[in-house]
Amino acid sequence: GLKLAVLSNKPHKQAVHVVETIFGKETFQWIQGQIDTVPRKPDPTAVLQIAEKLGATPEETLYIGDSEVDVATGKNAQMHTVGVTWGFRGKEVLEDAGAELIVDSPEEIMNMIED
């Protein structure tokens, strides 16, 4: 089935608190902020570790993000990259970063996954 994770460059405790406050504790199977022993994005180490913990290969993983750092992280991990326009950066920045797909709403992602 579909598994969801969050990887943030924000401090770990802050990332977990924000995500669980907004989405609840059951939405994501993994939430990870910056941990001192793991390199920051766009280094792929953390996202590859998370994918492995969730039983996913890079080839079957969508890395969804709102910045050029997110696109670079996904590409560095050999994952499919989706840029979202409702976050930190706009469409042009995501296109320039090389996102495979750019979407304007969460519904577009769900429709893509369901197809």
For every predicted segment, state its role:
Residues 12, 16-115:
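Asp-based, Mg2+/Mn2+-dependent phosphohydrolase catalytic module
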Residues 1-3, 89:
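A generic structured-segment signal
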Residues 3-5, 80:
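Proline-centered loop/turn at the N-terminus of a beta-strand
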Residues 8-10:
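Conserved phosphate-coupling serine/threonine residues in phosphotransfer and NTP-handling enzymes
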